Amino acid sequence: MPPADRQAPRAALDSGPKLGDKRARARDLGIHIGLLPSGDHDAITDVDGVSVGHATVREEGRLNTGVTVVLPHRGNPYRDKLPAALVVQNGYGKLVGATQLQELGELESAIALTATLNVHRVADALLDWLLELPGNEDVRSANVVVGETNDGRLSDIRARAVGPEHVTAAIASASMGAVEVGAVGAGAGTVCFGYKGGIGTSSRVIGGHTIGVLVQTNFGGQLNVR
């Protein structure tokens, strides 16, 4: 995805509403968006079996980047594939694994998000992890999925600072509970509407089903709330 607009971000990396020492989310402040109820965590992890982990890379004045990993379930994603689809709207990106998602409609790996120039490093590490899972010893073709945004305004993107150890750490930290949001993982260096962007998540429950989303916000324009 292209970098956000060139207007300087108007919020520091660690700014935001807080309740005590805990960073507050909208519903913590009594703000309820929409009519449908959310799940227990108001997160993508309210979908049964889904877990999320982050690894953040920071170096004062130089690096604000990282990787976020979404595990579709706790089993072997290659052996227990899931139905999947892909829609691209009003943008372009460097999404690894897009063709098989479109053509076969199956997900057979975890999904990772990172910075644009880290995509292939993360994909290589994610493939190593997948091939090393028990039961995958004879796998000769696998489709990992890695998305990205350009965090080059707040990080030295050419450093390609996310490596295999960060992917491993993100997977190891993946939890099916509350999801850490904001300037963390793949959201560490993002900018949105001229403000600090980050990782966001939510869920809604309808008719006995749970819909969960996770976003890596990084785009330009002006936000007008009327």
Region locations from a protein language model:
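Alpha/propeptide regions of enzymes that mature by internal proteolysis
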Residues: 2, 6-226
